[in-house]
Amino acid sequence: MDKKQSRLRRGRQTRAKIAELKVNRLAVHRTNLHIYASIIGPDATVLASASTLEAEVRQELAGQSGKGGNVAAAALVGKRVAEKALKAGIAEVAFDRSGFRYHGRVKAVAEAAREAGLKF
């Protein structure tokens, strides 16, 4: 079993437990260059999302080095997804790190979302 398959296996276990609880989840996906965060409902509908590909996020990151593959960009994405979720009336979610370690950019998304008012 290689590294990617192990990550996907861990992600499946997390998603199965969250599906059993029937709560909204904050799903995070990370690539080398970008980070994506989505609030997904129990019926698998996307209720709010944010990523480093959004024009507003890219404008805020324009003065910094890198395009979005850093902790500062991840924190900005976490803050934006929390703001969108609160605007949609979602205050509480389960954190789905998709098998990624809770470290670096994934941790930055979670902490920024908590600071912006989202409860895990």
Swiss-Prot record:
Q: Which UniProt keywords apply?
A: Ribonucleoprotein, Ribosomal protein, RNA-binding, rRNA-binding
Q: Which InterPro entries match?
A: Ribosomal_uL18_bac-type, Ribosomal_uL18_bac/euk
Citing just one GO molecular function, the answer is: structural constituent of ribosome
Tell me, what's a Pfam family for it?
Answer: Ribosomal_L18p
Is-annotated flag, keyword Thylakoid? Answer: no
Gene Ontology biological process terms from the UniProt entry: translation
GO CC term, one of those recorded: cytosolic large ribosomal subunit
Q: How does it assemble?
A: Part of the 50S ribosomal subunit; part of the 5S rRNA/L5/L18/L25 subcomplex. Contacts the 5S and 23S rRNAs.
Read off the PANTHER family from this record: 39S RIBOSOMAL PROTEIN L18, MITOCHONDRIAL (PTHR12899), LARGE RIBOSOMAL SUBUNIT PROTEIN UL18M (PTHR12899:SF3)
Family membership: Belongs to the universal ribosomal protein uL18 family.
Q: What does this protein do?
A: This is one of the proteins that bind and probably mediate the attachment of the 5S RNA into the large ribosomal subunit, where it forms part of the central protuberance.
Give the protein name, as stated in the record.
Large ribosomal subunit protein uL18
- Gene behind the chain: rplR
